[in-house]
């Protein structure tokens, strides 16, 4: 017994030692912030200096000079600790953050039939370059046709990289640049690629990057469709703008070290707009690589558009909340793809589908639900269905946990002949169409509840699935997508996020020939276009619109373009009713839709804009509980003077208001507007208050003698007596208007942080 116990103890000690050894020596990618000005004269470049501080030159992944000051390196924890303590020039070290993707009717829906129809933006938008950070590009897509495009702008300093599956000659006057950044990803994957399809190349083997880049600036392609659905002319928002793609997302996600390197390069390459349909959790701005890179872009006049995330309708789920980026949520179009389930009890259930196969004939089939190999058979997870039960039948699957298209594949592989995917409370009444591998439709929660009850109560329930193609002029629209992430902003609650919503449900755009439309390996279909949903799809809409505004108003700053899109956004749908939320069909609010749905026609001439300088953003950062070191990490300056900081972050000259009372009853903000309309203009204010808050604006009238003139006004918000501090929020608006313009700012009120 003693010998056995001793042996067991020895094994335990050895196992523990090996675990600790592996744990302490395991290498990771770290991002290292350095005092840029400390470089000794003995080193010619910062790259040489950084390399000298590492044990091995191969440990250095990227040197950052523009979007960030420092480098990224592949180190173990001991090396990282040693590096931080070895030099006063090393200011901060943190692990490489992982971000995820936020996955042709829209021009007409947005009123872009002819590039606004009032300005000749064709020639001027030729000079606009939109940089897209995503999964790369499929250059053979017809959406990158460069017919009649003039020569590439001389300001362009970028490249089209060759790779094992990508020839630099594939770029042209439309797709002018293509680069890939994979060092962070490769290190996280053990030094190589985790998928046989991936290589060091800008080639898009996922489809997402081709979809987003063609949405932003794809050339017009006639007779486009997705397997017969959404037929028409497919085109991006800025059809004459140039596209530069930066591949930063790979099979396991998008790493901050790669994103920073791409942003660094894109700024130096000369892009005018950066579009990022990706993001992660909320982090302080000094640890948010996207926010850090975007600050440098903004300072150099580059507009940055980011997706809000797909974690809705969960409260406080919005990502990419830095005030110097445009944060974009998603709404529906006035186009739908209806499908029906004709039940054996005579009822007809309405849903949506992009199924394009031969169908299931005219004979109803038996329905089954929640019967299989495990308790999770209701979700149709892999391995959960018993083929002896579902073979030859239609399976009802609850939405959630695994991908929607995977559920259809699980049903098909188990022998099922059809599927009805029914929403639960988490997704409410939102309907997203998918191109399943078998006849399948998606239905909302209420319809799903009726369906589940029918299957349970009928001894032999049956259904016949019917597909009706494409329908236009759907009412009401837009509706806020249930998946679209919501405020309040958890990093700085005094800044309202998201900023706007744009089209993000069932969007047709270009696709990669390397993968089927479902993204599943077993999907052998290939199509030039695909229909996708997500804030990933709404973000490039705004990126393209920003490019058009940049062409129309080259003198406008990124914050002026952002203001124009925000203050002209609308909050009434095509039935003239307030915007609704697809999650539960309730009225939407600014935590879901921000300032509203973008209206590019009105944004072209907003009347007034809220401009914000770099110095004002620094005053904003100084008002946060950040150290000077943290602020320097974001603004990349040798030192920062916070003597003129805002007393409240909400004092930033933002086009919307988010009032956090906390323990106060009175909050007062001053804003400054710039006249970009006509000379001799007069605007009067209209206040739409909230039940628990009094709002007063002084002055109540703004008179402008000239274009470019600036005027200030002050708003006082008073929480009425007797209002208890609760988690509830209330909303209102402040609108400056004259016969030609309405400049609207939403206001959100909260009494505690979250």
From Swiss-Prot:
EC annotation from Swiss-Prot or TrEMBL: 3.4.21.-
Signal peptide: 1-26
Residue positions with a glycan: 35, 223, 373, 641
Localization, UniProt: Secreted
Residues covered by the Inhibitor I9 domain: 29-102
Superkingdom as given in the UniProt entry: Eukaryota
Record propeptide residues: 27-102
Ranges of biased composition (kind: Basic and acidic residues): 195-209
Record-linked CDD domains: PA_subtilisin_like (cd02120), Peptidases_S8_3 (cd04852)
InterPro entries, per the entry: PA_domain (IPR003137), Peptidase_S8/S53_dom (IPR000209), Peptidase_S8/S53_dom_sf (IPR036852), Peptidase_S8_Ser-AS (IPR023828), Peptidase_S8_subtilisin-rel (IPR015500), Peptidases_S8_3 (IPR034197), S8pro/Inhibitor_I9 (IPR010259), S8pro/Inhibitor_I9_sf (IPR037045)
SUPFAM superfamilies registered for this protein in UniProt: Subtilisin-like (SSF52743)
Gene Ontology terms: cellular component: extracellular region; Golgi apparatus; mitochondrion; plasmodesma
Region Disordered, residue ranges: 191-215
GO MF: serine-type endopeptidase activity
PANTHER family linked to this entry: PROPROTEIN CONVERTASE SUBTILISIN/KEXIN (PTHR10795)
UniProt similarity note: Belongs to the peptidase S8 family.
Record's protein name: Subtilisin-like protease SBT1.8
Organism (species): Arabidopsis thaliana (Mouse-ear cress)
